[in-house]
Amino acid sequence: MRTAYFIFVGALLGVSYAKHHHAARAPIINLQGAEELVAVVREDENIISTVPDFAILSETGPVCNYLLTSQNNEPVPFDIQVVDKYTGAAVLRVKDAATLDCKKPEYNLQVQAVKCDNDNVKSEGVSLKIRVKDTNNHAPEIENPWYTFHVEEGKVVEEVGVLKASDKDCGHPNGEICEYEITNGLKELPFAINNHGVLRTTQPLNFTQSKSYILTVVAIDCAMRKSKSSLVTVHVDEKCVQGITAMNERVNYAPGVGSKLLLPDVSLEFCEKETICEPKSVQSVIELRAGHVTQGCARDTVYDNQTIQSCGLSTATVKLLNEEALTSSAENQILADQGIEFDGARGVTVSDENHQGLIPDHFTLSFSMKHAAGTKDEQSNKQNILCESDDFNMNRHHFSVYIRHCKLEVVLRREAGATSDFRAAEWRWSMPEVCDNEWHSYSLLFNGIDDVNVIVDGKSFKADERNPEILDDWPLHKTKATKTKLVVGACWHGRQQKLAQFFRGQLSSLYLLSGAVESERAIKCAHTCPEQLQFTGVDELLESQSATFSPDQTSLTLKAETSKQIGQMLKRVAYVNTQEKPAPGHRVFLVETEVTCKQDDKKMKLPSSKGYVFVQQAAEPTLSISASSQLKSNQHMVKVGQAMVPDLTITISQNNADGELEDVTQSHKIDYCKMHLQPARDMDVEYFSSPASLIAALNIEFEHDKDGILLRGEESAQGYKEVLSKVHYFNTRPESYAKRVYTVQCAMLKGRVLSNQLFVTMTIDGVTTTTSTTTEAPAPAQPDPIQFNFNSGETALDSLELIERHFEPAFDQLGSSRLQNILEMDLPRPKALLSHHGYDVGQGAIAGGAVAVVVVVCVGFLLVLLVIGVLKMRDTPMPRRRRQKRQSDGGMHWDDSGMNITVNPLDDVEKNGGAIDEFSDEEEEEETDGESECSYRDEEDDVSEDEEDQTEVLPHLDANQRVVGGLEWDDEDAISTNARSYRV
């Protein structure tokens, strides 16, 4: 018993000792073989993972806390939260109030595990290294939000200025600036910036183009994060450039725009210091260099109609060299500049139609020539421009103009009938223009052999004692053969019967006035260049300023006191070309400036400037016509006349100087318009109408042919539109066509400009017959008589108006041959006789003079009777009564489908009793006589098949029987008196 007690007490003491010993043991951090704890954290992270994880030896636990301390007693932005106190698992995190920054990239800390029940029991310290990783959470920053730099114009600057930027991030790539960028560089600004922020120019800057530039620049770190934009202003400092600046070297000129400024934005600078040259006066000379044809002044327009009228040139002048006639000839090459090239082996014989007989000693010869010097052998030979020599058996030169030794020489031999004197016969002019291989214009004025002058390019040649050389000779000897031959570009040798002494060069505009001499004033006027300079600032000139032109206005001299004044005057210099169609190409203009200094009147020349005027090809106007391409009609409308293009529109447009399309309809005229049927019309049944009164008021001729209509004559587009829109189409057998296709086309400028071809399709529908609602039609043999109400009142109508309103014309009641005869006369008719509502129908043929006289007499007589009848009807009130129909012995049978009545508008109305009586016997005799004069009895002898069928028009009448009684006329009278048939 005692033994058991001691065993129990010993066990209790052992357990108590074991517990005390365990509680007193310090925790041990398990590094799992590592020497220290390591962690990496991003600046923007809160939870940190360590290697290895936090843990303790399980037998040394439990732990409730970890203690973090720094070696330098710095604040620790971390704490550790225990997850499992027995294993020591914990989480390292950044304190809520703490912020990590890469500027402190590493933390060296000591970690100790603290016993749960006793804070004094701690583990040994373990090293914890935490490295902070940069996250590029800062954008780069440029030091200044605004930079200003200055650059001198005219040169490339490698360093305009330097921009500096920084980044609060650490190291590469987040903390380093790798690039600078100009963000508005899409505007092609002349600037660039490198990776170090150095701004430079890529091309010389121009103060005139832009006085300053504003750039937006950003800095970019190596991680491609951009900074905010910084504004950079670059001011361009103007550099004094001596001479003309801001000059547009190319000026485009469109024909017909009038004058155009050559130097609208120009300025003139003088950069010398006043100590060197103080300006006293400044002078600028503008020269327009316009040569022949390709370079500007077209000398071949010397003898055009406009020049002949304006300068008073003789209309008897003959053109000896016709370039247009030689276009298809293979003998000479037609050049692009409208000259003819002679290759030294060919010539052109002048026909007798252009010139006959010998050239007298009074004449004017004008021509344009381009001739090169050539070799010495070529210079020693005669090169004939124009030569008149014997046609057969002899080689005598009666007259010749030729080149030899680069001299222009003329031979004019007196004929055998002249006095036997030793007189002047040959002239030799020495002038540089002959062999400079440029186009020049020459005019030889022979007012007898003792009065000879030469005009070159519109300027008189200044003769002296030695130039020209004049050689004398005797007259030619008398011969039987007097026939001569005139040749251009060579000379005919009659003895050898071949051409010789050929010209080598180019000729153009060869004109001869035989037997008369043009005045020098007229020749100079004709050679005035149509291209000139103009000065538009005459009203702005000051007292010290002047503007002086050369005689031909191709040179202008401006004078002023300062360079700025000259610059303002240069802005007013303009170019003008008065030709309607100038030769396209470029013209050169030069500007020379000279400054006169106050110091000893020294003169200084400024740099010259050169520009070009590009004359564009004259744009032809565009002529367009439009209308509805589909036109619906019916047989009735075609029978009475269908307008063919009622909504026609004619428009003329042309590009203006700005290239914009402009309506110029009012400033042009139409030459002709044609309207053709496809296929061609049937001459027997198809006709056209023309508004005769309108055509008579316009300068238009109206013609018909098998294809259709032709309107011609220079007239406005509005005039043609009105006529064409009132042209009507007729068909006496409308059922023959279901549709008709026709085209309309117009032309202008002598036929050079054609309009579009307008296609119109006319669809002809059939006439719809209205059916009665009753099943039984009234008996055709006994219709109710037609009543005419002639009583006065609101509903009463004039008899003529009643006829026009209630009746329609029926062309089929007339034979086609008779109808064509009527239509061909195209004569005006009384209103009651018109069936086409004012349209004159015709084939275009005109009756003979005798027929016309008879027709005029008939129409006049009928008009008188018509007026008398109308006056009687209007003066006499008409009681209502039914017109009783009297049938002939054969009987009249009426057709219910339509009653044909031939109405004679000349019938008189009986005044007494209101009854419609016949005319008196006297009136009938007069009417019969009148009708016999204008009848077509002669034409009725040959009756066509269509005319033989006229009995179908009035089936109730016998063709050879006159109705007695109620009917006041018969079908025979209706045909012979031009009375219209109306269908009810």
Swiss-Prot record:
Interacts with isoform c of daf-2 (daf-2c); promoting daf-2c localization to synaptic regions. Interacts with klc-2. Interacts with unc-104. The keyword Signal applies. It comes from Caenorhabditis elegans. Keywords: Calcium, Cell adhesion, Cell projection, Glycoprotein, Golgi apparatus, Membrane, Repeat, Secreted, Signal, Synapse, Transmembrane, Transmembrane helix. The chain crosses the membrane at residues 851-871. The gene is casy-1. GO terms for biological process: associative learning; homophilic cell adhesion via plasma membrane adhesion molecules; olfactory learning; positive regulation of synapse assembly; positive regulation of synaptic transmission; positive regulation of synaptic vesicle transport; regulation of synaptic transmission, glutamatergic; synaptic transmission, GABAergic. Cell adhesion molecule involved in associative learning and memory. Acts as a regulator of GABAergic synaptic transmission at neuromuscular junctions by regulating GABA synaptic vesicle precursor transport: possibly functions as a cargo adapter for unc-104-mediated transport of synaptic vesicle precursors. Promotes localization of isoform c of daf-2 (daf-2c) to synaptic regions by acting as a signaling adapter between klc-2 and daf-2c. InterPro entries: Cadherin-like_dom, Cadherin-like_sf, CLSTN_C, ConA-like_dom_sf. Residues 872-984 are cytoplasmic. This is Calsyntenin-1. Its main location: Golgi.
